[in-house]
């Protein structure tokens, strides 16, 4: 759908929310809608090796015997729709049944996506070239649909650039995203051929991030994950996090070693220390030494406004996680996710009351 074209009206009936929030939906009620299919599906696709590794990790942390840990993990799957990763990352082993019931688990999140997002419109989010075209007014950088261009067009694009960012068209979790220095290649022809061999989807200019975020970690563009939900009254922001790169990689994704910290929606300040998928807490960034908690997100109000406007473009997608880069001039979209991550919403260092 080209930028500027009016989206077709949704055939999906809006849900009745109050305050534009999912709080009206009891997590247990939502889960029960897809309980049987979830259990059967997970049983068939379960990585049992990883399950038993998780049992061992929890055994080491708690001292509980392995059969008891396994039984509790299975019970949490049946009662709350929690996967074994939910159990470990959210530390279900430290929660009461009442606390566990408040958490958005994998099954609950998947059911919300099924209720709120029309699969016919996933294509505008799953493929980067389609996303960039659909949300062109929010992209804020030069880019090329690489499979559709000639070598001459590519040469014209890179002639005044020292480096470029290349991405697969449908990659997730930062996989396949690279920052390439033009001078590292003997010729433009050689670089063009390499990108063709690698099945690159989009080529784009390197974003310059706001100095406030660059000071925190200059090796990657540290993005905001802002999750929106839409109902008949419009768009609403559910929650937001800052994602921070680590280890010198050009991406900040959690699956690529990054960390995350929750943002206060009213003030734009980081509420707690950062946390990563290895369950490590960071008061300061390990490479820059900058204190994370209390940091002010630059251009915060503009970032929120950007995501609310973007949520209007494809109204059939009512539950979206937006990745936003903040440049010195303005926030811009990096991508949109039709299956927003739910786990970062409720990690132990960020939920001192143990309520999800």
Give the residues covered by each predicted segment.
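Intrinsically disordered, low-structural-confidence terminal and linker regions
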Residues: 1-46
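C-terminal active-site "lid" helix and adjoining low-complexity regulatory extension at the edge
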Residues: 22-24, 28-30, 49, 283-308, ...
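Conserved N-proximal alpha/beta basic substrate-recognition cap immediately N-terminal to
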Residues: 35-156
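Active-site nucleotide/adenylate-binding loops and adjacent lid/helix of ATP-dependent enzymes
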Residues: 111-224, 232
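Acidic carboxylate-rich catalytic motifs and surrounding loops in phosphoryl-/glycosyl-chemistry enzymes
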Residues: 145-149, 242, 320-323
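Protein kinase-like catalytic core scaffold
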Residues: 164, 236-238, 332-334
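Short, flexible loop/turn elements at secondary-structure junctions
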Residues: 170, 184, 205-207, 228-230, ...
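ATP-dependent carboxylate/phosphate-activation module, predominantly the ATP-grasp catalytic core
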Residues: 217, 221-305
């Amino acid at each position: 759908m080209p930028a500027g074209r009016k989206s077709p009206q949704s055939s999906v009936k809006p849900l009745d929310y109050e305050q534009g929030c999912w709080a009206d939906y009891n997590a247990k009620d939502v889960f029960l809608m897809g309980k049987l299919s979830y259990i059967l599906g997970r049983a068939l696709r379960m990585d049992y090796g990883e399950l038993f590794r998780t049992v061992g990790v929890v055994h080491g942390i708690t001292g509980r015997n392995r059969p008891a840990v396994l039984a509790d993990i299975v019970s949490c799957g049946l009662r709350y729709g929690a996967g074994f990763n939910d159990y470990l990352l959210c530390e279900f082993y430290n929660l009461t049944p009442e606390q566990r019931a408040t958490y958005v688990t994998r099954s609950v999140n998947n059911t919300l996506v099924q209720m709120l997002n029309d699969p016919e419109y996933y294509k505008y989010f799953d493929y980067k070239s389609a996303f960039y075209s659909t949300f062109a007014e929010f992209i804020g950088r030069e880019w090329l649909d690489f499979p559709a261009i000639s070598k001459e067009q590519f040469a014209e694009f890179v002639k005044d650039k020292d480096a470029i960012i290349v991405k697969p068209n449908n990659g997730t979790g930062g996989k396949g995203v690279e920052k390439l220095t033009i001078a590292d290649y003997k010729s433009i022809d050689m670089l063009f051929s390499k990108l063709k061999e690698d099945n690159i989807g989009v080529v784009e200019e390197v974003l310059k991030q706001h100095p406030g975020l660059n000071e925190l970690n200059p090796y990657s563009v540290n993005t905001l994950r802002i999750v929106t939900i839409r109902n008949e009254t419009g768009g609403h922001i559910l929650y937001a996090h800052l994602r921070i790169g680590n280890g010198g990689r050009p991406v900040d994704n959690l699956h690529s070693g990054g960390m995350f910290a929750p943002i206060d929606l009213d003030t734009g300040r980081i509420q707690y220390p950062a946390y990563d998928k290895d369950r490590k807490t960071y008061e300061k960034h390990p490479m820059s030494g900058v204190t994370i908690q209390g940091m002010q997100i630059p251009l915060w109000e503009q970032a929120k406004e950007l995501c609310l406007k973007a949520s209007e473009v494809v109204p059939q997608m009512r539950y979206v996680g937006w990745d936003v880069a903040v440049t010195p001039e303005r926030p811009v979209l990096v991508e949109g996710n039709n299956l927003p991550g739910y786990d970062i919403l409720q990690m132990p260092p960020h939920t001192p009351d143990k309520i999800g």
